[in-house]
């Protein structure tokens, strides 16, 4: 069983997916973390982390590194680098690198392999999860929220290291890039359950989703 969660950046996908995983006893996967790890690989290869590298160069670098999955976490060469990928430098570049078709193919293949060789149930969140990676998922969700709300959430997550105005600009730019991607663009898929989380807490959102999920299972019996 796969529950797929889609939506724009900072709409609550990761927090909600993690909590749903705990409540439903499903394993959690974030495709966004995988793209961020690849962005970290690119930045580590450069003298100036604000520069960019070509798609071919990045594809070669990925082959030189080991990305594995263990206990709902992607590891880079056996190391948990989550504290190194959730920052403004990664935010600034991850949309650019995730627009490379070759990179998206690698990420999608990795996600499918994790699920294919496992008997576990999964909650997988990320942009294009419901449209490209797992369009056949048994339950598809699209989480949304206003830019102002998303910026405030990220501001709190980052302990105020960036201003709200900076975060709003970053998110607007990210939305624009994600919606115009040639491959894997951000959009609503057929049969998706749409939920605006702007003024809902984590507990309320999870309760709504679980109620909808249970109702769907009853109807399909």
From Swiss-Prot:
Chief localization: cytoplasm
Location(s), subcellular: Cytoplasm
Main EC class the enzyme belongs to: transferase
Entry keyword annotation includes Coiled coil: no
Molecular function (Gene Ontology), one example: dCMP kinase activity
Residues reported to bind ATP: 7-15
UniProt keyword terms in alphabetical order: ATP-binding, Cytoplasm, Kinase, Nucleotide-binding, Transferase
Ranges in a coiled coil: none
Pfam families xrefs: Cytidylate_kin
One Gene Ontology term from the biological process aspect of the record: pyrimidine nucleotide metabolic process
EC number: 2.7.4.25
CDD domains hit by this protein: CMPK (cd02020)
Gene Ontology CC terms, in alphabetical order: cytoplasm
Catalysis: reaction(s): CMP + ATP = CDP + ADP; dCMP + ATP = dCDP + ADP
Family the UniProt entry places it in: Belongs to the cytidylate kinase family. Type 1 subfamily.
Protein name per UniProt: Cytidylate kinase
Organism encoding this protein: Borreliella burgdorferi (strain ZS7)
């Amino acid at each position: 069983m796969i529950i797929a969660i889609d939506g724009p950046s900072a709409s609550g996908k990761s927090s909600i997916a993690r909590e749903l995983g705990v409540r439903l006893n499903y394993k959690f996967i974030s495709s966004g973390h995988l793209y961020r790890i690849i962005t970290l690989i690119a930045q580590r290869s450069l003298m100036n982390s604000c520069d960019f590298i070509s798609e071919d160069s990045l594809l070669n670098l990925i082959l030189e590194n080991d990305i594995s999955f263990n206990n709902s976490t992607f590891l880079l060469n056996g190391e948990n680098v989550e504290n190194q990928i959730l920052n403004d430098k990664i935010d600034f570049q991850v949309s650019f690198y995730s627009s490379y078709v070759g990179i998206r193919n690698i990420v999608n293949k990795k996600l499918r392999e994790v699920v294919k060789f496992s008997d576990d149930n999964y909650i997988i969140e990320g942009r294009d999860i419901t449209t490209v990676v797992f369009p056949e998922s048994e339950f598809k969700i699209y989480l949304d929220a206003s830019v102002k709300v998303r910026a405030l959430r990220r501001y709190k997550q980052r302990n105020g290291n960036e201003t709200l105005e900076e975060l709003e600009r970053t998110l607007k730019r990210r939305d624009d890039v994600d919606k115009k991607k040639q491959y894997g663009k951000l959009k609503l898929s057929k049969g998706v359950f749409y939920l605006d989380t702007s003024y809902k807490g984590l507990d309320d959102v999870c309760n709504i989703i679980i109620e909808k999920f249970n109702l769907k299972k009853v109807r399909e019996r």
